[in-house]
From Swiss-Prot:
SUPFAM superfamilies: FKBP-like (SSF54534), Triger factor/SurA peptide-binding domain-like (SSF109998), Trigger factor ribosome-binding domain (SSF102735)
Annotated source species: Bifidobacterium longum subsp. infantis (strain ATCC 15697 / DSM 20088 / JCM 1222 / NCTC 11817 / S12)
NCBIfam families tied to this protein: tig
Reported function: Involved in protein export. Acts as a chaperone by maintaining the newly synthesized protein in an open conformation. Functions as a peptidyl-prolyl cis-trans isomerase.
Name of this chain's protein: Trigger factor
Family that this chain belongs to: Belongs to the FKBP-type PPIase family. Tig subfamily.
Assigned EC number: 5.2.1.8
């Protein structure tokens, strides 16, 4: 097999693959056997028709067509491995030459155009030192958490005064367009100042007492008249204020397992410190990835970027074409960063020769299944069916590479070494020997088990 590579862009290549007849022959033989299982030829048992008869009765073109369909993807994968090209999207195939008969010496020739990961030269990480901030827990952090807990035990009491920010008003709403009522709601509980309903509602309610009403102009944010201006009439039925408990030992015993307020505060401070350490670990991760990219110009694949931007915009608006310039700019910025981070972590995993084991993949998929309340076997079956197993393996490799890389780096805060072992874990002394292929095989077993379970249920 002869392979030539033409770089179309820094992240896009065109492979031209020429296949020798002896390399294509096994695929032709397999195609003949497969066709023999599907046709009836007088004088021969089904599945036992000689290849020459298949060529004569069915036609060599049909044989070659099936052989090429099987051969091209496999030979393409081999070409990628041989040329060390890491694809980031599906290829575009163009079959140019195909033998026309069993005796035709024409070589199979096809091209594959695909977006690829660019070559990335990472710095040496052994001995690398990265400065990060020191986690701090201030008194106001503790007070803020304590106030949040206090609000959970607050009660609403009716007040005989005009509504103000922070109060809860029970209201009736009626929206009209050109004098016609298009929407109405009764008995809605609304917190003044929350700005969670119509624009202008907070201003309209401010200063109103129970029994009073007013009108204002607002833009409807839901329903068939979404986006249209309407005249909104709002009536206040009642006004309630939040009454919070006193911060004392009685509150501490009611709101927690502690008997005194001092004990509760100490526990809150401890939790705040743990959260601060978690934020420090996140900062360390981000700083490490940024350090790997320092001074590097990493291009991103245009097609992959465009698809990811479109998917992100779909989460913001039903029609991505109607997204605002700000939304598009933000989506592009986010996607570019995510792509560069992913490509750098992929390169790091290769540099560190990260091995992805069967248990790594199963644990990863099982944890996701648990998050969604799904059976692990059924979840793995869905992953395989959707062709996402490779992506799962890639995610595991990135994660393992990131942890291994961060363990090799010294992180400091105010000149002192930071111990992140609680987040990074310890490097395994004995890595399991299972390969990525073993993970695929294991997932296939899970797929088979799940299929058997479905068959039993159907009986």
């Amino acid at each position: 097999m002869k392979i030539s590579v033409r770089n179309l862009e820094p992240t896009k290549v065109k492979l031209t693959v020429t296949v020798e007849p002896e390399e294509l022959n096994p695929y032709l033989d397999a195609a003949r056997k497969e066709i023999a299982k599907q046709v009836n030829v007088p004088g021969f048992r089904k599945g036992h028709v000689p290849g020459k008869i298949i060529d004569q009765r069915i036609g060599f073109a049909a044989v070659a067509g099936e052989a090429v369909n099987d051969a091209v993807p496999e030979l393409y994968s081999k070409a990628l491995d041989e040329k060390k090209i890491r694809p980031m999207a599906q290829p575009e195939f163009d079959v140019q030459d195909v033998p026309q008969s069993a005796n035709d010496e024409t070589k199979l020739k096809f091209t594959a155009t695909v977006e690829r990961r660019p070559d990335i030269e990472l710095p040496e990480i052994d001995g690398l030192e990265i400065a990060i901030s020191k986690p701090e827990v201030k008194d106001e952090d503790v007070d803020k958490r304590l106030e949040t807990l206090r609000q959970r035990f607050g009660t609403l009491v009716g007040v005989d005064r005009p509504a103000a920010k922070g109060d809860f008003a029970n209201i009736d709403l009626t929206a009209e367009i050109d004098g016609e009522t298009v929407d109405s709601q009764e008995g809605v509980s609304y917190e003044l100042g929350s700005n969670t309903m119509l624009d202008g509602l907070d201003e309209a309610l401010d200063g109103l007492s129970a029994g009073e009403e007013t009108t204002f102009e607002g833009t409807l944010e839901a329903g068939e008249h979404e986006g249209q201006k309407a005249t909104v009439k709002v009536k206040v039925n009642s006004v309630k204020a939040e009454e919070l408990p006193e911060l004392d030992d009685e509150f501490a015993s009611e709101a927690s397992e502690f008997d005194t307020l001092d004990e509760l505060k100490a526990d809150i401070r401890k939790a705040a410190a743990q959260d601060a350490e978690g934020r420090q670990a996140t900062e360390a991760r981000d700083a490490f990835i940024a350090k790997l990219q320092e001074g590097l110009e990493i291009p991103v694949p245009k097609g992959v970027k465009a698809n990811m931007v479109e998917e992100q915009l779909k989460g913001l608006t039903p029609d991505p074409e109607k997204a605002t310039k700000e939304q598009k700019a933000q989506a592009e910025e986010t996607v570019e960063k995510d792509l560069r981070d992913q490509m750098v972590l992929d390169a790091l995993a290769e540099k560190l020769d990260v091995q992805v084991s069967q248990s790594d993949v199963f644990n990863f998929l099982a944890s996701i299944a648990q998050q969604y309340g799904m059976d692990p076997n059924n979840f793995i079956q869905a992953i395989i069916k959707n062709g996402q197993l490779g992506s799962a393996v890639q995610e595991v490799a990135r994660s393992k590479g990131l942890l291994a890389g961060m363990r090799a780096v010294k992180f400091t805060a105010d000149g002192e070494v930071v111990d992140l072992s609680g987040f990074l874990g310890e490097a395994a002394e004995d890595e399991e020997s299972e390969s990525v292929e073993a993970a695929s095989a294991a997932a296939a077993v899970a797929d088979e088990l799940s299929a058997k379970d479905d068959a039993k249920d159907a009986e």
